[in-house]
Amino acid sequence: VKPHGALYNKAAKDINIATTIAEAVKEVDASLILFGLANSESGKAAEKAGLNFYNEVFADRTYTDEGQLTPRSEYNAMINTNEEAIDQVLQMISKGTVTSTNGHTIPIQADTICIHGDGEHAVSFAQHINSIILASNIQIVSKA
């Protein structure tokens, strides 16, 4: 289960919203997996509710020093080249870190990777990232 848009972003920062979502998912089916932003309140709420949680990272977004997504209102919020997207994804997968917009290395767990489908570079990013992951002998698996 993945909340979308503003709800996803609010749950990442607000433990009350994250808890409400986690409890609702648990009530429907405790075996469901909750997806949410890595390093967020969503993960804490899922753990407290006893749900499986997948830490989602973004190939097409930059990160703050706090490990959160750079707000879209910032000029440097989006990644716009295949090379940047590939480098970021490989760093998150292989090293468990991401480099913030200020150059700091932030710990991050990558269980699933998001590429915004409405992004200008979505198809290209997906194709190139998939190719590099496979060429790097990184196994893509379903955890379900």
What are these regions (language model features)?
Residues 14-20:
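Charged helix-capping and loop-helix junction motifs
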